[in-house]
Amino acid sequence: MMSKLTHIDQTGAANMVDVGAKDETERQAVAEGSVRMNLETLALILEGNAAKGDVIGAARLAGIMAAKKTADLIPLCHPLMLTKVAVEIEPDQTLPGLRVRALAKLKGRTGVEMEALTAVSVTCLTIYDMAKAVDKHMEIGGIRVTEKGGGKSGDWKA
């Protein structure tokens, strides 16, 4: 674990980290999360009968778009030239609900954990938005980074 917060300077003020001297390397991050819902709501989504349309398709696109906007949403986050963002949404009858996984990749000087987390978060929020009319008890949770690769600190898995 690092000994200090990198986005705070010596005086305690917010600071955008200078990554200009870092080498460009292939980097990737994977994040996950889930939306718990009633089994009836899950069935409605999987059958394509939600009033707002294709929940899974819309949520996937929203997550990809959100990853590309991470620097606009998170203060001090570097704007990145992502080379890939992939969002997977899988039904889980035992949850019950939808499990979301996002992969973000680039060749650059800083990691893509925030982009993967943003993709998962907005995907889950979109699922919630599109199904809230039929299920007021949905719960978003478990959002975390599960792996990262590349850069000076190397590879990591949860």
From Swiss-Prot:
**Keyword set, alphabetical order:** Lyase, Molybdenum cofactor biosynthesis
Catalytic machinery residues: 129
- Protein name in UniProt: Cyclic pyranopterin monophosphate synthase
Lyase in keyword set:
yes
The similarity comment for this entry is:
Belongs to the MoaC family.
Pathway connected to this protein: Cofactor biosynthesis; molybdopterin biosynthesis
Catalytic reactions of this protein? (8S)-3',8-cyclo-7,8-dihydroguanosine 5'-triphosphate = cyclic pyranopterin phosphate + diphosphate
Q: Which GO terms describe its molecular function?
A: cyclic pyranopterin monophosphate synthase activity
Q: Which Pfam families match?
A: MoaC (PF01967)
Detail which positions bind substrate: 76-78, 114-115
Q: What does this protein do?
A: Catalyzes the conversion of (8S)-3',8-cyclo-7,8-dihydroguanosine 5'-triphosphate to cyclic pyranopterin monophosphate (cPMP).
For this protein, the record's NCBIfam families field holds: moaC, PRK09364.1
Cite the EC number: 4.6.1.17
One GO BP on record is:
Mo-molybdopterin cofactor biosynthetic process
Q: How does it assemble?
A: Homohexamer; trimer of dimers.
